[in-house]
Amino acid sequence: IGGYSLQQTRSEGFVRGALLITAGSLISRILGVFYRPVAQIPLGEDGLAMVSPPNAPYMLILAISSTGLNVAVSRLVSQRLAVGDLRGARRVVRLSSTVLGIGGVIFSLLFAFAAPWMARVQGFPEATPGFLALAPAILMVTLEVSLRGLYQGMQQMRPAAMTMVIEQLGRVIIGLAGVFLLTPIALNLGAAAFNAGNTVGVFLGLVYVVYIYMRDRPMKNWTTVAPGVESWEKLSTWQLMREI
């Protein structure tokens, strides 16, 4: 179809893809079960109390900046590939990457600058380092979203599944190492290391998916449009944003 084929994208098929996502999610959850209980050994109840304040605003900002966009990008890429509009699919990925990247920078900076205020409002001014540790993760998550959406739109679920596992491994290993190393120095630094584990995990997941993208260059040959198909490449930025 318009130069696009399942062989070109090495599609793994819906069933296999679903199994990969399920397996990745399961492994990620199993690893996560041990994270908090082990961290509690050096942190204690007081340290864990400082871990929680940054999480609520962090999750709220992620919900505003990126939740659902992974699915939206995936759906639109899949739709354009199905009709042979490879140029349109490429534009969806590029525009979403640009918009998400800009949004990620803005929200990360806002989160970092507001960190002392958010910590004071929640009654834990000593948790400010934890807020700062999470700020870069917002940008990295938004960058990762469009690439994961690209691969899921191509019915390639392995990158998404592997990303989940890599993120959780990084979170647990680096986070716990930081907790055990920094808690003896200062309790709030140990708590911040717990939060920083999340950022490191997201960073490793982003590195992996970027590596896969640079290795495969999946959009390299997305230069054609099937006869009779109106390409989304011709849509204005505003029109395409409304679709996303």
Locations of regions flagged by a protein language model:
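N-terminal membrane topogenesis motif
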Residues: 1-33, 91, 231-244
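Interfacial transmembrane-helix starts/ends
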Residues: 15, 52, 87-102, 241
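Interfacial/gating helices of multi-pass transporter permease domains
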Residues: 39-60, 187, 191-195, 236-243
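Small-residue-rich midsections of specific transmembrane alpha-helices
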Residues: 52-77, 139-140
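Short membrane-interface helical motifs at transmembrane helix boundaries
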Residues: 106-128
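Alpha-helical transmembrane segments of multi-pass membrane proteins
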Residues: 124-147
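Membrane-interface junctions at transmembrane-helix termini in multi-pass inner-membrane proteins
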Residues: 142-163
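Membrane-interface helix-loop junctions in multi-pass transport and translocation proteins
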Residues: 157-158, 169-215
